[in-house]
From Swiss-Prot:
One of its GO terms (cellular component) is cytosol. GO terms for biological process: lysine biosynthetic process via diaminopimelate. It comes from Baumannia cicadellinicola subsp. Homalodisca coagulata. The keyword Amino-acid biosynthesis applies. This is Diaminopimelate epimerase. It holds the Pfam family DAP_epimerase. It is found in: Cytoplasm. Gene3D superfamilies: Diaminopimelate Epimerase, Chain A, domain 1.
């Protein structure tokens, strides 16, 4: 099995071409490969598959380091765009992909920068999914004392955003796993901790479900900005600084698609003899 190791702002991936290769990896095998001591080491495994729709160029599957399959990864989408061009699976600069829950348009700009149309953020509780009505704010604030509950949103995957005064001292490793598996999130959730610097700049740390805290989370950056704009705290275009680097997020508001721009980096190619 041939693969590429890639990263987007330090959020690292093992990317596999399943268009020209026949590949199946069990959850146990994925966990083994994800191990940074005995395997390849990665936050997520990405499968690039043939499309299921004539209007789509590729189907995109994402597996977390714990072997669970998830429905969205913004940093991974940028790496996918770089990967399919690099491997000559397409010569397009605008690439249409599908996931289990959404469709995205990836536009390769220059110098390995990629702009991703992440679709329209969803705030309706059943679409997140979030199985509670009316009292979610009180319950979440009880779990995450000394934080301001920003909101919950789906960017193709669920996110809970907390607003903090100082992102460096945020208890990401404590609050993150508590909220990730909270009973009201039927599919678990990603948890973002956002510090607002001004209307055009935020600092963000993200605890990703099935992974833990990562250097960057593209969909998490999108979720944080969408929540911030909805609360009237942020402008339409915002620079999000994560531990691994910066993303630019643009959203005009309800009913509009949200856009993320950032880098995609190829590290090396490898081969695993099964």
């Amino acid at each position: 099995m041939q693969f590429s190791k890639m990263h987007g702002l330090g959020n690292d991936f093992m990317v596999v071409d399943v268009v020209t290769q026949n590949v199946y990896l069990s959850p146990t095998k994925i966990r083994f490969l994800a191990n940074r001591h005995s395997g390849v080491g990665f936050d997520q495994l990405l499968f690039v598959e043939p499309p299921y729709d004539p209007e789509i160029d590729f189907h995109y599957r994402i597996f977390n380091a714990d072997g669970s399959e998830v429905t969205q990864c913004g940093n991974g989408a940028r790496c996918l765009a770089h990967f399919v061009r690099m491997k000559k699976l397409t010569n397009k600069r605008e690439i249409y992909i599908s996931t289990q829950t959404s469709r995205m348009v990836l536009t390769i700009i220059e110098n390995n920068m990629v702009r991703v149309n992440m679709g329209v953020p969803k705030f309706e509780l059943p679409q997140i999914p979030f199985d509670m009505h009316q009292i979610e704010k009180k319950e979440i604030l009880y779990l995450a004392k000394n934080y301001i509950f920003g909101g919950i949103v789906s960017i193709g995957n669920p996110h809970c955003i907390m607003i903090v005064n100082n992102v460096d001292s945020a208890q990401v490793s404590i609050i993150g796993p508590i909220l990730e598996i909270h009973k009201y999130f039927s599919e678990r959730t990603n948890v973002g901790f956002m510090q607002v610097i001004n209307r055009e700049q935020v600092l963000l740390r993200v605890y990703e479900r099935g992974v833990g805290e990562t250097q960057a989370c593209g969909s998490g950056a999108c979720a944080a900005v969408a929540i911030g704009i909805r609360l009237g705290l942020l402008a339409e275009q915002v620079q999000v600084a994560l531990p691994g680097g910066k993303l630019v997020i643009y959203w005009r508001g309800p009913g509009q698609s949200l856009y993320m721009t950032g880098p995609a980096v190829h590290i090396y190619d490898g081969f695993i003899n099964d």
